[in-house]
């Protein structure tokens, strides 16, 4: 099976593909990939052919879709207008380009991945999706609820099992309440956080389970 990984970033997809014999993955990103390109400037029709990939996986940058940006309005010159402009001029073009490449390549299956808490779901309304929690597929210590738009059928998504059942949770020593070991931000108040690069990873189990259905 041949997979194209758009916005490869942490290379979660090729790392997961290495678990299966016969799977190969071609990566695309600004650096450290098979195609080191800005997808907005890339003439992909010269490098790629329709139907040469069985699956296209795309993880468009989530930064400009994050609702957390709104909490920074008033800081560092950020305004409601600039947040909206960044979404429309920096975030959406990358998403639209990914959708355009998928349409051109005509893969058997596709997956577009992004945080479920972000605004990308406001702009992808025509595709079916699944919602998963990373803590149900890894021992990474944090939840990170994620949305997967895909035409893959038969996938059974898993979300957090909750207190006492989720191995990634612990009791807060101060309040006694259950919480995930790590926060999906820089942390604080006695709780360790995560780096952006760590949060950008996708658990191999999610990738393999999806691709096994292709």
Curated annotation (Swiss-Prot):
Reaction(s) the record says it catalyses: a 2'-deoxycytidine in DNA + S-adenosyl-L-methionine = a 5-methyl-2'-deoxycytidine in DNA + S-adenosyl-L-homocysteine + H(+)
GO biological process, one term: methylation
Keyword set, alphabetical order: Chromatin regulator, DNA-binding, Methyltransferase, S-adenosyl-L-methionine, Transferase
Listed GO MF terms: DNA (cytosine-5-)-methyltransferase activity; DNA binding
Keyword Transferase: yes
Coiled-coil stretches noted in the UniProt entry, renumbered to this chain: none
Disulphide bridges: none
Purpose of the protein: This is probably the methylase that recognizes and modifies 5'-CpG-3'.
Quaternary assembly: Probably requires another subunit for function.
Family: Belongs to the class I-like SAM-binding methyltransferase superfamily. C5-methyltransferase family.
Protein name from the UniProt record: Probable DNA (cytosine-5)-methyltransferase
Organism whose genome encodes this protein: Frog virus 3 (isolate Goorha) (FV-3)
């Amino acid at each position: 099976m041949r997979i194209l990984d758009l916005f490869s970033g942490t290379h979660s997809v090729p790392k997961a593909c290495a678990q299966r014999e016969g799977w190969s993955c071609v990566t695309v990103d600004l650096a450290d990939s098979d195609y080191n390109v800005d997808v907005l400037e890339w003439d992909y029709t010269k490098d790629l052919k329709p139907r040469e990939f069985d699956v296209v996986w795309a993880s468009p940058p989530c930064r400009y879709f994050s609702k957390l940006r709104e909490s920074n309005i008033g800081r560092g010159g950020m305004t409601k207008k600039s947040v909206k402009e960044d979404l429309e001029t920096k975030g959406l073009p990358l998403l639209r380009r990914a959708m355009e490449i998928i349409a051109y390549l005509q893969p058997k299956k596709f997956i577009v991945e992004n945080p479920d808490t972000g605004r990308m779901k406001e702009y992808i309304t025509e595709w079916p999706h699944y919602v998963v929690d990373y803590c149900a597929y890894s021992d990474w210590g944090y939840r990170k609820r994620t949305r997967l738009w895909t035409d893959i059928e038969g996938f059974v998504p898993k979300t957090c099992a909750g207190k006492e059942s989720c191995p990634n949770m612990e009791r807060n020593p101060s309040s006694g309440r259950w919480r995930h070991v790590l926060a999906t931000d820089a942390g604080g108040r006695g709780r360790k956080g995560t780096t952006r690069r760590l949060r950008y990873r996708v658990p191999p189990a999610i990738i393999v389970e999806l691709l096994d259905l292709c």
